[in-house]
Regions:
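N-terminal intrinsically disordered, cationic/polar leader segments
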Residues: 2-146, 150-179
Length: 179
């Protein structure tokens, strides 16, 4: 059984954590994040240590305990160091470019696919085949990267499409053909 919820969270210097009833605000050098804490969880801040406690050992509360602790930890990590996800575009003629606050991708469709930059996210396009999604909110960075990937998911026969940089695509063999 995991005991992640019991581990205290240390708040680094330069990060300000404020708790108003059930609303947690984390302010750091990269920005500010806010989140509402579940009604069953109790968050206490003593000095530069945050602890999360649960009322009892019911299954729901055990699940929420670790989740709440990890969400708070991710908020603190995000305002100190940005989160980033790297996507790679594989395919002949597939490319991405940044135009103002839009990401424009040519993905083999009859039209370019345009995507507005969500609030709190920045796109970097170091070359035509790489997109880097950056932001302080881990959840939003992951969600945005997943939305970009769904525009043209990698296909298993040729490996063409948008994939995460660390993702490995299991390739399939084409059909054998007649003899």
């Amino acid at each position: 059984m995991s005991r992640i919820g019991n581990k205290p969270i240390t708040v680094p210097d330069g990060v300000e954590v404020k708790l108003d009833d059930r609303h947690l605000t984390v302010k750091g050098p990269k920005g500010t994040l806010e989140r509402d804490i579940h009604k069953n969880m109790t968050v206490s801040i003593e000095g530069n240590v945050i602890t999360v406690t649960r009322p009892n050992d019911e299954a729901e509360n055990r699940s929420l305990h670790g989740l709440t602790r990890t969400l708070i930890s991710n908020m603190i990590e995000g305002v100190v160091n940005e989160y980033k996800r790297e996507l790679q575009i594989v395919g002949v003629g597939y490319r991405a470019q940044k135009q103002g606050n839009k990401l424009v991708m040519n993905l083999g469709y009859s039209h370019p696919v345009e995507m507005e930059t969500p609030k709190g996210i920045t796109f970097d396009v170091p070359n035509a085949n790489t997109i880097i999604v950056k932001g302080i909110d881990k959840e939003l960075v992951g969600q945005t990267a997943a939305v970009i990937r769904t525009k043209r998911p990698p296909e298993v026969y040729h490996g063409k499409g948008i994939k995460y940089a660390e993702e490995h695509i299991r390739r399939k063999e084409g059909k054998a053909g007649k003899k």
